[in-house]
């Protein structure tokens, strides 16, 4: 039955094309390109790269935004692994075709050299031009700036606006656009006036509350979020286990950016028996939840270099061959580490500040979250490292270590981002066993871990400011009409959670969802 159901889902999927004998040569070329993609392989630049159906849907929506609404600044939200860069390259190719004979100058902006290099190779492949574009980042210096892949750091340090007029670039792509609310991007976004601005991101939501949507008429032109991507079999399913952590983070220093990383690192590495007990929990949980440790190809996300090194040594001492990498590791070290992991020589790479954005090891089948991740963007990027499809890979196993957290730590958004049904609150999902997980996915919380999360979420309703904030965003979050009954039902609240502070109408007025009013009896 399972085989028949799987076949039926593939047969009816729009992601597959009908095959006939006259397409044999095209299939052979495509399979070869998929297997042997190499930026130095000239044959790559002779292949026709066509969009998948979901990518074509996004391209069509972009065209509609521009032709019907006349919006030339557009944001595409696409889950890690769905080919955001390919979409931008295909869109640029269409732009060039529509403006044949014109320069069609391109500026592609990102904040990491790895992203820029991969993006340049992608554009060259889509355009079938091995000489297209140049890098301006690190040690790379371009001969021409007409088609430029530029880091935001170089843009600012080189005073790039002095070299170019506001309308010099016809088409500008800003990758990982969630960074664009930062001060470093403001000069670029305010100075240039391109014919087309395209923003790309997997998660437009920022933990500091600053929105990037005003750059795009407060609209998302097209999106394919993580649950939809899994449902459409563009990413592999996951089994997520929330493991009860042995350490209490409730007393650690908290600032605007989250936990103090130094205190976290010391707790995880220098606290003697506490650190060893936690590391032992990680190993025992791994052995409990994975089917075969010898088949594991894993990444462990750590808070510091010391933490990554500590976990690496602990795993090796337990007979689980591992290495660690940091943001300072060279390209050669990273490539060698990837090869050793894929070949099975090692089981884990413990990392700090890498494998978040723009780096892929599709074979990864296990991810360990060994530190609290305050940023939803980073959480989804790190999760996405393991969601790539790969041969003989059935699913991704995720172990997230959950302890008592600061009341300001946001568990809710993290779990909401994993669920297909946005009309049910996270509290209800926890109580019902995460029935809205994407197809083929499974979320399980250990008993104490579930209690820590529920207590944390409920605490966020424990003051008037928290209630006002949730009322203000209720319709957007839930898709429901804002009524007292809907609010209580969605958040699984007792009415006393509201009325111990104020009336529901007064909270709505403070949230600007209704007009202010005067009620003498309130006194």
Q: Where does each model-flagged region fall?
A:
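Post-DEXD/H (motif II) to motif III coupling segment of the RecA-like Helicase ATP-binding lobe
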Residues: 179-241
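Conserved helicase/translocase motor-coupling segment
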Residues: 265-339
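Conserved interdomain linker/interface between the two RecA-like ATPase lobes of SF2 helicase motors
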Residues: 220-299
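Long, largely alpha-helical accessory region at the distal end of helicase-like NTP-driven motors
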Residues: 26-50, 288, 413-523
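Conserved helix-turn-beta segment of the N-terminal RecA-like "Helicase ATP-binding" lobe
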Residues: 114-137
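Conserved segment of the helicase C-terminal RecA-like domain
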Residues: 376-381, 385-415
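Conserved helicase ATPase core of P-loop NTP-dependent helicases/translocases
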Residues: 117, 135-141, 160, 309-312, ...
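ATP-dependent helicase/translocase motor core
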Residues: 1-82, 86-104, 121-125
